[in-house]
Amino acid sequence: MVNTLPKPGIKTPSKETVLTPRFYTTDFETAANLDLSAQENELQAMLAEMRADYNRHHFVRDEAFEQSWEHIDGEARQAFIEYLERSCISEFSGFLLFKELSRKLKNRSPVLAEMFQLMARDEARHAGFLNKAMGDFKLSLDLATVTKTRTYTFFPIEWVLYTVYLSEKIGYWRYIIIFRHLEKHPENQFYPIFRYFESWCQDENRHGDIFKALLRSQPQLWNNWKARLWSRFFLLSVFATHTLTVHERSGFYKSLGLDATDFDLQVVRNTNETAGRAFPVMLNTEHPKFFPLLQRCAGYNLNISEIERSSQPKFVKLIRKLPLIAAIVWNLLMVYLIKPIDTEALRETVR
């Protein structure tokens, strides 16, 4: 008889939901045929920067980690472990995608292959550092098993460029906002990993800049009406996911001395502004209905989670959740229909 129980200290990954980090695969043939000539100089400069590996000595645990963490307990402990797990899975997802792209493109597009190899190096470093942090709480993720058991979602390479760009840039803003907040309020820095966020976020920023160059090298991804619609869709998808997730885990942000709603506003506003440098449009986050609609969705999502935790039969849960799901979809549609800001027109004005 085969023992299928997890080993002691090995954490069973959280159940996959719409909001959990996903694993992706893509069309490697299309990726190999991307014409990068329009951004060749920028990409070569970024490749040289990636080879320099400025953070190669950064992810080293120091003596601050060498202590008992039993004083972090109860809901705060659980919330922090969930944060570490989500972050680890997200970084590991990036590692797997970049590693596979590097392997598949090695003989077809060597510059792009090396770029993905170096980004995979960074993501693996991040995931390993986060998993070691989980070890301080007597848990860890079996990433080899996660690789085999996780569901993989296929995205065309064009979608990968949009979504990974946004993922890296929103990651940058999340890390730097937390770091700056804890610089001002060191009494809330309850674990040493947060001290690493300033240099850590620079990896995210560099990766985002690479994807910006890749995106701008493909005019069809920014110079037509379809690209504008897709840009709005992916911006809204990423921001809605962030808003719902942050409010789901408001306890973690409270433990850092952050208000979840205020943190979400800062991250979304800054990421949107940054995305305007790459995308043909950015969302109008200053519209009076923009954040209230997103926050309403977050409230509905909390109601759904409460229903899911109840002991009612699955059918009853589904009936109760359906109107809430419909309300989320409707409110997100209202956000999508808010007139966006034409960033290409702004670029022309600056010129």
From Swiss-Prot:
Names of required cofactors: Fe cation
Pfam families: Rubrerythrin
Pathway assignment: Porphyrin-containing compound metabolism; chlorophyll biosynthesis (light-independent)
InterPro entries per UniProt: AcsF, Ferritin-like_SF, Rr_diiron-bd_dom
UniProt GO MF annotations: iron ion binding; magnesium-protoporphyrin IX monomethyl ester (oxidative) cyclase activity
EC number(s) on file: 1.14.13.81
The reaction(s) this protein catalyses: Mg-protoporphyrin IX 13-monomethyl ester + 3 NADPH + 3 O2 + 2 H(+) = 3,8-divinyl protochlorophyllide a + 3 NADP(+) + 5 H2O
rRNA processing listed as a keyword: no
Protein keywords: Chlorophyll biosynthesis, Iron, Metal-binding, NADP, Oxidoreductase, Photosynthesis
UniProt-listed GO biological process terms: light-independent chlorophyll biosynthetic process; photosynthesis
Annotated family: Belongs to the AcsF family.
PANTHER family xrefs: MAGNESIUM-PROTOPORPHYRIN IX MONOMETHYL ESTER [OXIDATIVE] CYCLASE, CHLOROPLASTIC
NCBIfam families: AcsF, PRK13654.1
Function of the protein: Catalyzes the formation of the isocyclic ring in chlorophyll biosynthesis. Mediates the cyclase reaction, which results in the formation of divinylprotochlorophyllide (Pchlide) characteristic of all chlorophylls from magnesium-protoporphyrin IX 13-monomethyl ester (MgPMME).
Protein name (record): Magnesium-protoporphyrin IX monomethyl ester [oxidative] cyclase 1
Organism encoding this protein: Nostoc sp. (strain PCC 7120 / SAG 25.82 / UTEX 2576)
Gene transcribed to yield this protein: acsF1
